[in-house]
From Swiss-Prot:
Localization in the cell: Nucleus
Assembly information from the UniProt record: May interact (via the DCUN1 domain) with unneddylated cullins.
PANTHER family: DCN1-LIKE PROTEIN 4, RP42 RELATED
Protein name: DCN1-like protein 4
CC terms in the record's Gene Ontology section: nucleus; ubiquitin ligase complex
Free-text note regarding domains: The DCUN1 domain, also known as PONY domain, may mediate the interaction with cullins.
Family annotation (InterPro entries): DCN-prot, DCN1-like_PONY, PONY_dom
Gene giving rise to this polypeptide: dcun1d4
GO MF, any single term: ubiquitin conjugating enzyme binding
Task of the protein: Contributes to the neddylation of all cullins by transferring NEDD8 from N-terminally acetylated NEDD8-conjugating E2s enzyme to different cullin C-terminal domain-RBX complexes.
Keywords associated with the record: Nucleus
Length: 280
């Protein structure tokens, strides 16, 4: 009797397991179960039995860190904006800069010009000052008016000593362009002459020629000697412009100089003086 009861229980369990196995495979075919092995099922059961993990609540330290990060972003944006404003040209700043050197008559005169040159680290006789004056379209040597300053510095985008210092190399490079050099050379004549005179006095002419041609025209020292011993007291604009053309086109031995060409008498006399000097 006992044996029959045990067999009945065993058969009942086996039948139940077979039914469960059949149901599982049916669900599997219908994609209603995960394709996992027995071990995974055990893990899944365990995980379903475990309660879900709670999200960690932010602490006071987290709040401070987030606040500091936001503040840092604000500071970085403000700093970037300040840099942009400092780099951008400001007419107001340019005007304030002008009055560091100008007198009560709204003109930078000799004293202000001396301080200005000292601040930008350039000697007043440096050729870069001539280029700057040309950029400002200054009308009188040693003077910058308010209008010239604002217009010229605006074109250079300079509203401070530091910005102009950083632009000096650019101003020097302008002389390397033949067209710009010719414009500056012609400008220099009117810039340097007395406004009630049509010509340059000889001493001023020699200084300006030395500034513009002294380092690029090998014959300049000889030409300067010629001027010193000549009868000339002034140089007119036609003579001035032809000296530049002469320096650019005539060979150093003067072999291609045409005495019948349209050169001014000044240069005819220089060529004659030079040849006599070479022969003696």
């Amino acid at each position: 009797m006992h044996s029959d009861a045990s067999n009945f229980q065993l058969n009942s369990h086996l039948s139940t397991l077979a039914s469960i196995h059949k149901i599982y495979h049916t669900l599997h075919r219908l994609n209603l179960t995960e394709d996992v092995g027995p071990e995974s099922h055990g893990t899944a059961c365990c995980s379903r039995a475990m309660p879900p993990r709670k999200k960690r609540r932010p602490t006071a330290g987290d709040d401070l860190s987030a606040k500091k990060s936001r503040q840092d972003n604000v500071y970085r944006k403000q700093e970037a904006l300040q840099i942009q404003e400092a780099e951008a040209f400001s007419s107001k700043r340019c005007l304030e800069w002008f009055y560091e050197y100008a007198g009560c008559d709204d003109v930078v005169g000799p004293e202000g010009m001396e301080k200005f040159c000292e601040d930008i680290g350039v000697e007043p006789e440096n050729v870069v000052m001539l280029v700057l004056a040309w950029k400002l379209d200054a009308q009188s040597m040693g003077y910058f008016t308010l209008q010239e300053w604002l217009k010229g510095m605006g074109s250079l985008q300079c509203d401070s000593t530091e910005k102009l210092r950083n632009s000096l190399d650019y101003l020097r490079s302008v002389l390397n362009d033949a067209t710009s050099f010719k414009l500056i050379y012609r400008y220099a004549f009117d810039f340097a002459r007395e406004k009630d005179q049509r010509s340059l006095d000889l001493n001023t002419a020699k200084c300006m020629l030395g500034l513009l041609l002294g380092k690029t025209w090998p014959l300049f020292p000889v030409f300067n000697q010629f001027l010193e011993q000549s009868k000339y007291k002034v140089i007119n604009k036609d003579q001035w412009c032809n000296v530049l053309e002469f320096s650019r086109t005539i060979n150093l031995d003067l072999s291609n100089y045409d005495e019948d060409g349209a050169w001014p008498v000044l240069l005819d006399e220089f060529v004659e003086w030079y040849k006599d000097r070479e022969m003696s």
